[in-house]
Amino acid sequence: MCIRDSPEADSKLIQGVTFELMGNCGMSFCAPLSKDNKYQLQERLNRYGIRKEMDWNNFDDWLTEIENNMPSINVAAQIGHGNLRSYVMGMEARQANPDELNKMKDEIQKACDQGVLGFSTGLWYAPGSYSSAEEIIELAKIANRNNILYSSHIRSESDDSSGLFPAHAEAIEIARRTGVRVQISHVKSVGPKFWGRGYELIEGIEKARNEGLDVAGDQYPYYWSSTPISGCMFPRWSLEGGREKTLLRMKDSDIREKIKNETTNFINRFHGAQGCVLADYPEDTNLEGLNLIEISKIKNTTPEESVMQLYEKSEGSFILHSMEEKDVNEIAKYKYMCVASDGNSLKADGPLSSGKPHPRSYGTNARFIEQFVSGNKIVSFEEAIFRMTSYPAERLSLKKRGKIALNFFADINIFKINEIKENATYVSPHQYSEGMKTVIVNGQISVINGKKVKGRHGKVIRSFSD
């Protein structure tokens, strides 16, 4: 919804981003929409005081909605498996039956016909976490038939029941079984058991590529991640049936204790309670920017109980110290790793300036250049540009984007490398990056000397030739 309600996309455009792919991690909240999906979407918007009539149901109408608002940057969509599954079968923790699986296949085909360029899964998040590999394989076959990208927030990035390396292998197996192009989203190794082992993820991708599989990844260049409260603090079984069912479980003292015991394990993955910072919590903005130790002192209880009390009042999100520098650097060096923010297009004023979101929305690309190219020099300038421009376009099969070439759309940045600077921080995230002298979108100048100029020149991309 960010790109519709704030088509200026300031946090991205000012740092030189001219294209955004929506719907990652299985979360295409805006399509397809059932009555229940619309209610859930409005609940999310209510937290920011946004009330919008949702008079669309499918991708065609949703993308037209964005077009009518004239975005500042180019936009393309993915159909998210989590949204698709809830559209067809709700939040039930079970396998899809044949009729439900066929309906999901049909919806993917409809979405492809209406202009989506990707199919995404969030296999860590409910309800995607309730699906089997076989379900994803069957759906990925439809993606492959239409030559769209399959991107996946894999089933685990740490040491829970699935496990990091089996989850990584599952994504590669989907490529092997279907032929689909696989993009492993925000590649990372989380938790004490996996810190220092990021290189093994790269070895896995390289082995798959040597086998002839089209597998790659993307990364945001930070040591902290960001996830909704329910997504990072509670076991998957406790989320079955959606928020209302979860709240009912929390009222049962025995179940509550069971959830809290598992929450302890989650907290320990993030360098403890001090590594869990509440980023977005409209219910009580005074708590935003505080870590779980500080919140627990205010609430006079444990970090685990504090998390549950927060969620009982409202969903929110945490920034989490989930990674180590060595792993982030190792992954950043890999040539088949795109740079991708995993963050929304935001603004430093208005409803989208609320909370203390992850600074990646304002600084991913600037940080990659400043830290890995100019700073520790682990990535060459030429390779950094490739991994932010032509390689992402290639992954999406975009035929006229990502390069300065004859008959290509002119999406161009002009800058001096030593002037690129990220200003957003975890404490003060709503700050624009600096250093872009000129940003050109579809041949039209959109930024001069770091300042936006009048007009919005982005397009909704619905085909590989747009």
Where is each model-derived feature located?
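Short acidic, glycine/serine/threonine-rich loops at helix termini
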Residues: 5, 30-36, 86-92, 131-133, ...
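Hydrophobic, small-residue-rich alpha-helical packing segments that form membrane-like cores
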Residues: 28-34, 40, 47-177
